[in-house]
Amino acid sequence: KNVYKSYKNIASQFESNRILNISGEYHYLYKCSECKTLDGFSKFKSRLFWIVCGYGERPTYALITSLEIILIFAIIYLFTGISIGGRLINYRLSWFSILEKKIILVDFLESLYFSLVTFTTVGYGDIIPTGTSIILSSIEMILGVTMVGIWTATLARKITR
């Protein structure tokens, strides 16, 4: 149970001696160990910080989380509705047995493109969200801005060490 305190002390020693790369690794171990002792909302927050950026020590976690967000929203958009040049994509689960796999793949790629463009807040306007997708695309934009900032900050922190 006190292992996390040892990691914290080791991280502090490396940091005070300006050995920042190793200090960062021990900080990561400290936070991972500390998470095991937490409960409730504190544990939830700690796990979220681990998933999103590896406690500020793993920029690839932010990149992977971003890709997962884009993929999840792309799938959701297939069911909540997007309009491409007047053609509405708004699937129902029962349609999967009727539709050709090629059509589903093309629609998924269009949805993935829309999700990526929305996440990066480019928003070309060639695909328009409809219905619930309007709210979801706003949420994805906010997540996109946040995740790009987290990834940039985490990467800059690692590079400057």
Predicted segments with their positions:
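Disordered, glycine- and acidic residue-rich low-complexity segments typified by the G-patch motif
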Residues: 1-39
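Residue-level hotspots within the lipid-embedded alpha helices of multi-pass solute transporters
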Residues: 13, 66, 142-145
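Short amphipathic alpha-helical coupling elements at transmembrane boundaries
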Residues: 25-28, 50, 114, 137
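Coil-to-alpha-helix initiation sites in intrinsically disordered, low-complexity, charged segments
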Residues: 35-47, 94, 103-110, 130
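Transmembrane alpha-helical segments and their cytosolic interface motifs
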Residues: 40-80
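Outer-pore turret/helix-boundary of cation channels
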Residues: 67-111
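Pore domain of cation channels
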Residues: 99-161
